[in-house]
């Protein structure tokens, strides 16, 4: 299987470290540990053993998410990912098969668009119009 090149991400990767002001970046500048944790909290981390963590998120974090959204579900219904790209990938890989159809709003971040097409999923676009206030 050959995946389509994700041109936006490719261009950002090529040039993101070559500019003084990166206007294409959608994330935030990384913080330092000292900006997040107190000295005591930093020392606590230094005393922790390193081990292979929970791939689906710690039970405590999953419970906190569950507490926010719905009390009628169990921890098995909550999955923590390392970011939206992983969540998008898991959604496509577990919910769709070749020949299935999805409707995808554009303009948008095109990760799902290219991944789905590479897997034989039919992608129909729903263009949002500037002149209609980004509605369809």
Regions found by a protein language model. Give the residues of each.
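N-terminal small-domain helix-loop-helix segment of the aminotransferase-like
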Residues: 2-83, 90
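Short, hydrophobic alpha-helical packing/hinge segments within bilobed ligand-binding/sensory domains
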Residues: 87-88, 112
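Short amphipathic alpha-helical segments
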Residues: 35-36, 92-93, 115-117
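Conserved glycine-rich SAM-binding loop
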Residues: 83-84, 108
